[in-house]
Amino acid sequence: MSGIYIHIPFCKQACHYCDFHFSTSLKKKDAMVLALAKEIVLRKEEFQDEIVETIYFGGGTPSILEVSDLSLLIDTVFSNYKVIENPEITVEANPDDLSKERIIELANHRVNRLSIGIQSFFEDDLKLMNRAHNSMEAKNCLEIATQYFENISIDLIYGIPGMSNEKWLQNIATALSFNIPHISSYALTVEPKTALHTFIQKGIIPKLDDEVAHEHFHLLVDKLEQIGFIHYELSNFGKPTYFSKNNSSYWLGKKYIGIGPSAHSYNGIYRSWNVSNNTMYLKSIAENKLPSETEILSKTDRYNEYIMTGLRTIWGVSLVRIEEEFGKTYLDYLMQQAQKFLLDDLLFIENEILKPTQKGKFLSDGIASDLFLLNLE
């Protein structure tokens, strides 16, 4: 089973923390939709032997498109690929785009999962992050969306300056009041060349506090696990049967094609990525050329990726797989590097699977980096 990711590189405005590829100009929107459809067709040979299980619209802001545009792209996938009968089709959306009419229209055009960028239910947080929606729109869209969609995920951000533990718990409680079956939650991070980075440098916004983010993370984990959510990936929580099939395929090393500017693809042997420039992308597709670069993954690259994705998920890192796929030298190296984390109760081994402990979960990315960064070839 495989997946198709379609990047919609447009947003109404730039969130202060975001460094993803997008444009706030919609002048090339129609041309982009046609180019995306054309790339889907141009790349069908890559997936001729694959069964498509998921279609995911990310961005940017996919909900900025007309539903007819999204429907055209979905139909193009169905016409050119082998797709299972009921694939998971996810559209990332912002609350300000989700009127009742738009929600009903999406539900009537094969979309069966919404991923809604709530981020916070508090007005001051939304203004600090320069989100396009307000608190009332966040609540209203969930009130309506839950009437038409069973499978909904929302994004929440923690570690926001001025966010107390009590305020964070209120955000979680508000989200749960809508009976949402999936929550993705991330610490606010400062990326170079973002407005947030500039504001912190100038002292307009206080520096982020890692300890606060750490506390918020554990409050979230404790609260959601108490009521039956499964913490199946570092930033993702789902009720049983509501895990994101699309994202799970990335973490489990399945093949996927990325369509659109800046989108990445992976087939188990090499990784490729499209140019992060809308004009260059459109020009290349118009010339029937794929605007991508390719990197063949070495054994060490694949080992490192497995360590990173494995430690972020409930599936962990299989020591048996490490030895079978990469060899005893890699396994010996892994066990040597892991010893200090095992002794510090940050990692544990169960049934030949290496996993982070509750204490180690928040630190899993840092732990993973200590387990790779090597070249044994």
Kindly label every feature range from the protein language model.
Residues L342-E352:
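A short, conserved structural fragment
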Residues M1-I8:
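Immediate flanking context of iron-sulfur cluster ligation sites
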Residues P9-F20:
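Local cysteine-cluster metal-coordination motifs and their immediate loop/turn environment
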Residues I353-T357:
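Minor-groove-contacting beta-hairpin "wing" of winged helix-turn-helix DNA-binding domains
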Residues K359-E377:
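Short, amphipathic alpha-helical interaction segments positioned at domain boundaries
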Residues L319-V320, D332, I349:
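Extended hydrophobic-aromatic, low-complexity segments
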Residues M1, F22-E45, E50-K328:
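C-terminal scaffold of the Radical SAM
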